[in-house]
């Protein structure tokens, strides 16, 4: 086994499995770990072959501008391109736009498109497609979550067939990173009526088959604009809700990759010399959300009490094991960010939590349901960990777990108390604007604050690094004072794959970029 370390990784023990049912399902499989046979190292890239990638959750939406789940974004990355590619270091690189420039005040951005790029249905990309894409995102009827993220755009217009200009209402120095990193900013053709039924991009693979809850088939785009790429003939993404099946498949070679394995199975993969485990630093996090517009969390005392119930270091270890992930402090800015304000995380204080609950009218504690969804490593573990902590404060939590598709359609943005998952974006501005701007479609907590809105706008407007960091510090202070979420850790992006999968570059956002990948 080799471990490709893109971030800090502990070589020590991962926390042992605490759920007997899961442990029994993996007990026999773990013994296979020592049976891997080291394959030879090929020196040149080879063309051809099919790889099988396992997801725990299943994609639901195929429209790139309204896709909600991580399974959708990661898979659609193979079908579509953005104007700009934000690479694994979060640096903007040319993609459909071969170059770009901005005015000195960063309010007007001009992108020059590549000539001869073809959509999967055969027509060449032009500026009208880019204008169509962004106007579709801006249209309230589309209900794209990216609409709030791009609220600074006053207009997008065609300059000539291969040049597009964005005029902004206010300066934004990271606009290129935003169009490259936004999950929903994938360029789509203006002449395809239903992108959910007919996903049509310019990407390295074409989507030829989608069976909800079962599999997705992607085939090589022979007309891809990057010469010689991709190398693989086909990618088959299979839906396997039981992670034990992922482990068995990787051990036997029936699978080539498991997308985002949990902390419980990482030691099993690490024990097999034919499997690589990669870990990429990420802005992603898994918050416990409290809806401030619904009881009991419409009372600030209750929100504060729940935050004081949490032992953040313990919750981090329960959710991500011994991965070297720093403790966070109930806001989206991770400790490894240059914008992070040094601070001591809120400490657990059960007695104060009890008093706050009593002051809020819950002198005998409370009974409450917490929703969590299966299919994403860490979520159920975090819910059960917090449930156990809350008992000491006489808070009796019943954890209700459902599959991701049911959670996202019936409970997310509706229930008053749940744990969810945020993939890391490529800018901190986007992380904030998507979830904490008052009018954001994905404002899970319904925490609406003009002060926060003004600060998010300040992050976007401010160009001078020191002043920008000061704005981020004010945002963090407001979260520390009255966060609508318990954010105990920022989870890295983890992939496990067979060693014969060559030149796969893990991305912090969990995207599957198979353009240069080949089978050795």
Where are these regions (language model features)?
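N-terminal secretory signal peptides
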Residues: 1-18, 28-30
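N-terminal lobe/hinge region of extracytoplasmic solute-binding protein
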Residues: 54-104, 135, 200-202
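Gly/Pro-rich hinge or "lid" segments in bacterial periplasmic/extracellular proteins
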Residues: 87-91, 172, 177-236, 242-244, ...
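Surface-exposed binding/hinge segments that line
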Residues: 112, 146-188, 209
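Ligand-site clamp/hinge motif
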Residues: 193, 223-268, 387-388, 396-398
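Structural transition elements
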Residues: 205, 324-359, 376-379
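Periplasmic-binding protein-like
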Residues: 268, 293, 297-336, 381-382, ...
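Extracytoplasmic/peripheral linker and loop segments enriched in polar/acidic and small residues
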Residues: 392, 396-407, 431-499, 520
């Amino acid at each position: 086994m080799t471990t490709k370390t893109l971030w800090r990784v502990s070589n020590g023990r991962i926390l042992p499995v605490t759920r007997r049912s899961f442990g029994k399902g993996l007990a026999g499989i773990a013994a296979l770990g020592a049976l891997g046979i080291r394959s030879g190292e090929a020196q040149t890239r080879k063309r051809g072959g099919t790889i099988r990638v396992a997801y725990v959750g299943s994609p639901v939406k195929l429209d790139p501008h309204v896709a909600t789940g991580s399974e959708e974004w990661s898979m659609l990355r193979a079908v579509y391109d953005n104007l700009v590619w934000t690479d694994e270091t979060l640096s903007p690189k040319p993609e459909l736009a071969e170059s770009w420039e901005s005015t000195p005040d960063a309010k007007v951005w001009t992108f020059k498109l590549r000539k001869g790029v073809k959509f999967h249905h055969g027509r060449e990309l032009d500026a009208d497609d880019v204008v169509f894409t962004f106007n579709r995102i801006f249209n309230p009827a589309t209900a794209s979550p990216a609409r709030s993220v791009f609220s600074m755009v006053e207009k997008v217009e065609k300059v000539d067939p291969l040049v597009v200009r964005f005029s902004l209402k206010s300066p934004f120095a990271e606009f290129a990173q935003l169009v490259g990193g936004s999950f929903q900013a994938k360029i789509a053709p203006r002449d395809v009526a239903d992108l959910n039924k007919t996903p049509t991009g310019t990407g390295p693979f074409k989507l030829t088959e989608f069976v909800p809850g079962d599999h997705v088939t992607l085939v090589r785009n022979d007309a891809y604009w990057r010469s010689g790429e991709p190398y693989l003939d086909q990618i088959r993404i299979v839906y396997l809700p039981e992670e034990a099946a992922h482990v068995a498949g990787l051990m036997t070679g029936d699978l080539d990759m498991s997308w985002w394995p949990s902390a419980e199975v990482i030691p099993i993969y690490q024990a097999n010399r034919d499997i690589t485990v990669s870990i990429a630093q990420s802005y992603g996090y898994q918050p416990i959300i409290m809806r401030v517009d619904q009881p009991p969390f419409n009372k600030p005392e209750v929100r504060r009490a729940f935050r004081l119930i949490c032992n953040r270091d313990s919750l981090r270890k329960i959710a991500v094991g011994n991965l070297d992930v720093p403790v966070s402090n109930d806001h989206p800015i991770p400790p490894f960010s240059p914008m992070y304000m040094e601070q001591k995380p809120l400490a657990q204080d059960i007695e104060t939590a009890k008093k706050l609950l009593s002051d809020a009218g819950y002198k005998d504690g409370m009974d409450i349901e917490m929703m969590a969804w299966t299919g994403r490593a860490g979520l159920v573990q975090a819910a059960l960990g917090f449930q156990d902590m809350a008992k000491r404060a006489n808070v009796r939590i019943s954890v209700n777990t459902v599959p991701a598709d049911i959670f996202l359609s019936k409970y997310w943005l509706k229930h008053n108390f749940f744990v969810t998952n945020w993939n890391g974006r490529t800018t901190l501005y986007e992380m904030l604007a998507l979830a904490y701007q008052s009018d954001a479609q994905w404002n899970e907590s319904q925490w609406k604050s003009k002060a926060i809105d003004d600060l998010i706008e300040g992050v976007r407007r401010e160009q001078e690094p020191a002043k920008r960091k000061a704005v981020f510090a004010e945002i963090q202070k407001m979260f520390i004072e009255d966060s609508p979420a318990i954010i105990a850790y920022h989870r890295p992006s983890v992939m496990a794959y067979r060693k014969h999968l060559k030149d796969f570059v893990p991305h912090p956002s969990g995207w599957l970029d198979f353009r240069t990948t080949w089978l050795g």
